[in-house]
Structures are given as structure tokens and as C-alpha cells.
Amino acid sequence: SDLEILYRILTGPAGGQLMSILAADSHGNRIARAIAWLRENYARPIRIEDVAERVGMSVSSFHQHFKAVTAMTPVQYQKQLRLHEARRLMLLERLDAGTASHRVGYQSPSQFSREYARVYGLSPARDVEASRESMSTAAE
């Protein structure tokens, strides 16, 4: 049964570590809450101090634990969320790059294009065109 599996996991060799991660007040739980908040608020301007305070951590501890969990800084994580959502908007909702970039929180279209190309390897327009071509080829 599911309860038996859960019992065996929690009483096994990694059980203590897993329990500390799942503990309501653990760093892992606080980072999970910060990630959930960032996912809902990625388009807003954020201050790391505010996010750290929101989850009850000092800025330095928040940075350290966030990077340990995500392998990136909170700002890099927000940027990745914004770029991913902008790409989704351009591909699926057929928004142009300027509209998509503004909707996900970028103030500068040129900054958006630079960061997009750095992550996806192409300008937004070329990436969307190439992605649509590969989707139509795959559908044939």
C-alpha cells in the first residue's frame, strides 16, 4: 500500500534527511514557498530582500539555500520563468516579441531580445519561426 511505501521510505537510510526537508519550517520548505511565489509573481518587479522576508529568511541564507535547490540565483530563476512564459506566449498565443516581453515583465524589448537569444540561441522571431517549422514538420 502507499502508506507502507511511505513508512519504509521515512524509516529507511534517507528518512531523516527527507523528514528535515519536508519539515514545515525547514530551509527546503521555505525555498519551495519562495519558488511557488516567484512562479505566481514572475512578471512583477521583485526585490530579493522582500522574497527572503516573505519566507522568513535572511537574504544571505535565502540566496545560499535557493541556489543549492535550484542551481541558480533567485534573479536568474525569475528571468528563466519570464523567458519561458514569453516563448510560450509567442508560440501558442501568437503574440509578437514586444507584447510577450511586456506581458512577462520586461521593460526593455532590447534587453528581452538579448536575454532570449542568450538562453535559446536565436532571436525571439527566429526561434519562434524555427519552432513552428519543426512543429509543422513533426505533424506531417
Predicted features by range, described:
Residues 8-14, 39, 45-81, 101-126:
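Basic/polar phosphate-binding segments, predominantly the helix-turn-helix DNA-binding elements
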Residues 119, 131-134:
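Short, leucine/isoleucine-rich alpha-helical interaction segments at C-terminal helix-coil junctions
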Residues 134-140:
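C-terminal regulatory/oligomerization modules of transcriptional regulators
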Residues 2, 6-10, 14-46, 50-55, ...:
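A short, Lys/Arg-enriched amphipathic alpha-helix from helix-turn-helix/homeodomain DNA-binding modules
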